[in-house]
UniProtKB/Swiss-Prot annotation:
Taxonomic placement: Archaea, Methanobacteriati, Methanobacteriota, Thermococci, Thermococcales
Pfam families: DNA_binding_1, MGMT_N
Record protein name field: Methylated-DNA--protein-cysteine methyltransferase
Localization (cell): Cytoplasm
UniProt keyword list: Cytoplasm, DNA damage, DNA repair, Methyltransferase, Transferase
Function: Involved in the cellular defense against the biological effects of O6-methylguanine (O6-MeG) and O4-methylthymine (O4-MeT) in DNA. Repairs the methylated nucleobase in DNA by stoichiometrically transferring the methyl group to a cysteine residue in the enzyme. This is a suicide reaction: the enzyme is irreversibly inactivated.
Length: 175
């Protein structure tokens, strides 16, 4: 099923879409309206189905978008959202990366790809790949993972990453 809701963060509207069955299968969002959100939903559905997840796009009302919004604005801790995630279609490595990031890097903090890789005895490139494939943005705070010399990449848009970090109170992201 899918549930879509809009919320305000200061001057910006965020539209959050949640794909779910018993638990959250995937999350996507847009600061650029419904049309861009639909593109993001299509990309998420393709990603999930390519990984064997059965997705039902029947619209259903749910409090899950509000949960994600409350995590975004800091009313609920990211790690408290982990229990709502299905982890369907993720590899054991990705699940470990997502859980470690969510539990260890708190709101208002950032970590480099290299630092997270060292923590997990992996490579920065493998961490970057896991971040790019993260089906649970905001709950699993991939926006908090930065390059050693700049903000780093972010799907769908780098300015989304900047906004999410600023919303959390991060002022600088270079060492």
């Amino acid at each position: 099923m899918i549930s879509i809701k809009s919320f305000q963060i200061g001057e910006k509207e965020i539209v959050i879409a949640i794909l779910f069955d018993k638990k959250i299968q995937g999350i996507t969002f847009s600061f650029d309206g419904e049309q861009f959100l639909q593109e993001r939903v299509n990309a998420l559905v393709e990603h999930l189905t390519n990984r064997g997840v059965k997705v039902n796009l029947e619209e259903r009302d749910s409090e899950l978008p509000a949960l994600v919004y409350k995590i975004l604005i800091g009313e609920i801790r990211n790690q408290d959202g982990l229990e709502y995630l299905s982890f369907e279609g993720t590899t054991p490595f990705e699940k470990k990366v997502y859980e470690t990031l969510t539990k260890k890097v708190k709101r208002g903090e950032v970590i480099t790809y290299g630092e997270l890789a060292k923590m997990l005895r992996s490579s920065p490139r493998a961490i970057g790949g896991a971040m790019k494939r993260n089906p649970y943005p905001i709950i699993v705070p991939c926006h908090r993972v930065i390059a050693s010399n700049n903000i780093g990449n972010y799907t769908p848009k780098r300015e989304y990453k900047r906004f999410l970090l600023e919303t959390e109170g991060v002022k600088t992201w270079t060492s």
